[in-house]
Amino acid sequence: MNKEELLGFLLDDSIDSQKRCVTDQQAYSNWLKNDNDERTAHEESSSQSTIAALNKKKQTEAAQEDIEELLNGLEGIIGGADPRNLKSKSKRKTKKGGSKPREENVNTEKHIVMLEVEDFSDMSTHEDVNGASPSPNLDRSKKNEKRRKNAKELSYDELKDKLEVTTRKSRLECKDLKKKVHGLERRNLELEQRLEELKIENQTLIEINNKLLKNTNEDEINKSQRNKEKDRKRRERRTARRKDERKQEKKQEKKQDNKTSQSFPSSTDMNGQPIEF
């Protein structure tokens, strides 16, 4: 299995491609195992070759474990994404000048896998031509460690940048929240002052209302007293008028009596005194 096929099934995360990923991984492991067995059988001729084969076996197993871990990590990271959409999205993101954290992680893992595949291809071609030798394996292991370290530093720098961006956003949000809190506290003080003013106004209105009620009661009392006084005076005037009317009636009666007595002829008795009827 070549490098392009390995990268192809890493980027394609559909159900069929995941099955193909498992089968290709098993085939790759079998190929490594068979190649390792053949190389071990060939190198058993000398003690130096045997030591180199054992070192190569350990290194191959460690590298295989690293690749399996990377494959499992990539399957969890890029699961549920269409590879064609992922490629098109990554192109669009690079044109715009930025990409999502998920795509950055995928690109980082892809870079690591490419380095691993290149190392294995270089190792296999070199050993097929020149045979096993300890010193190139040692150099390759150092290069692998250096590349892993560089990839980790790259991912660390990306995480550091993301952390700085998140910290900056959090600080801005914290400032906004502090401003809102200060505004709410100021508004609360204003409302408390307004409440005190309303309490004072309410107390003033209550006092005014009590005074008005008191004045109203006094007015009603005074009015009733005035009405009583008016009634008394009215009764007195009525009685006085009636007395005057009676006096006038008596006078009229006397006058009438005098007129009637004058209208009749007077008669005298034997003594010459008028006779009254």
Swiss-Prot record:
Region (Disordered): 33-168, 210-277
GO cellular component: cytoplasm
Subcellular location: Cytoplasm
Compositional bias ranges of the Basic and acidic residues kind: 34-45, 100-113, 151-168, 216-230, 242-258
Keywords on record: Cytoplasm
Biased composition (Basic residues): 86-99, 231-241
One of the GO BP terms on file: nuclear-transcribed mRNA catabolic process
Biased composition (Polar residues): 259-271
Extra information: Present with 1730 molecules/cell in log phase SD medium.
Protein name per its UniProtKB record: Uncharacterized protein YKL023W
